Amino acid sequence: MPAYWVARSRIIDPAEYKKYTDRIPAIFAKYGGRVLARGGRFQIMEGPEKFHRFVVVEFDTFEQGVACFQSPEYEEAAAFRRNGAGEVETVMVEGGDATPSSLPSRAGR
């Protein structure tokens, strides 16, 4: 089942951030990632407008996406971004339909 790496970012230092983005295409390719959206037009539909760049990458499986994020290559590239060049929130989402039977139980609430 496909999975999607969704990242929201705010670039603080474009020159340093570019050191990160220059390395990313080869890393995504190594792990089978396909960029579906990167930096295009967007509209905040709900919530605060904190970020100004969005990226969506598809992987064949959830595990491939997580392996990419946790890889030494990605960690090395992300160090440029994490050193103050940008602020990012990333989530890996497995594709599919979240039917009531697949949602977490609310027991004990």
Q: At which residue positions do the language-model features occur?
A:
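Short S/T/G/P-rich N-terminal loop/turn motif that feeds into the first structured element of a domain
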Residues: 1-54, 59-70, 94-109
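C-terminal structural segments of small proteins and small subunits
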Residues: 75-92
